[in-house]
């Protein structure tokens, strides 16, 4: 049985709510249902354009959840200030483009290295763990290690869009390299029941972040049932 943790991203609950600019579905209620059905932590992405999650959502979740909050943000001064006020268990730094539908790829840690040094140091000052969302690439992992990041999250989008052995091998290689460099390894983006079960089998990956697929499934089956089924899919993967 796999002990890989499941992080449920609830951004698109807010997307549905914001479609009519109302106060339902309540994001805290949905998060708590996910937790009661096996979610080990809750993830939200506070984007600069606030297209789904709003500032108030983040504070409400932090004050209400009985599991850790993983806050995804772009590495900007505004977002740093918010993260310090919220004090989530973990901040995951992601790249952002205004016109993208979703995060399109990993953070270029090497390119942003000089800026990220002080950014990560400040988060660590407030005992906030730092994860960097990156492509499954050993050079990016090396840079993350130099920055003293606690974890990386491997972008699985390319594998999910093109489920070849070559793409899977990149994830496997990167996860093993994380172990060698003594940096935590998570994975996420584009995962469904089948691909999550496969990625959960990869040695040294300790957590998966899954959002859009689960929210879509919840329209048909409810958030509790969908999270429970995902938890079972992950647990079915052998250690």
Curated annotation (Swiss-Prot):
InterPro entries found in the cross-reference section: Aldolase_TIM, PyrdxlP_synth_PdxJ, Pyridoxine-5'_phos_synth
Annotated site location: Transition state stabilizer: 153
EC numbers for this chain: 2.6.99.2
Broad class of enzyme this protein falls into: transferase
Localization: Cytoplasm
GO annotation terms (biological process): pyridoxine biosynthetic process
Catalysed reaction equations from the record: 3-amino-2-oxopropyl phosphate + 1-deoxy-D-xylulose 5-phosphate = pyridoxine 5'-phosphate + phosphate + 2 H2O + H(+)
Keywords from the UniProt entry: Cytoplasm, Pyridoxine biosynthesis, Transferase
Domain of life: Bacteria
One Pfam family here: PdxJ
Catalytic residues, chain numbering: 45, 72, 189
Function of the protein: Catalyzes the complicated ring closure reaction between the two acyclic compounds 1-deoxy-D-xylulose-5-phosphate (DXP) and 3-amino-2-oxopropyl phosphate (1-amino-acetone-3-phosphate or AAP) to form pyridoxine 5'-phosphate (PNP) and inorganic phosphate.
Subunit relationships: Homooctamer; tetramer of dimers.
Stored NCBIfam families: pdxJ, PRK05265.1-3, PRK05265.1-5
Family assignment from sequence similarity: Belongs to the PNP synthase family.
Name under which the protein is recorded: Pyridoxine 5'-phosphate synthase
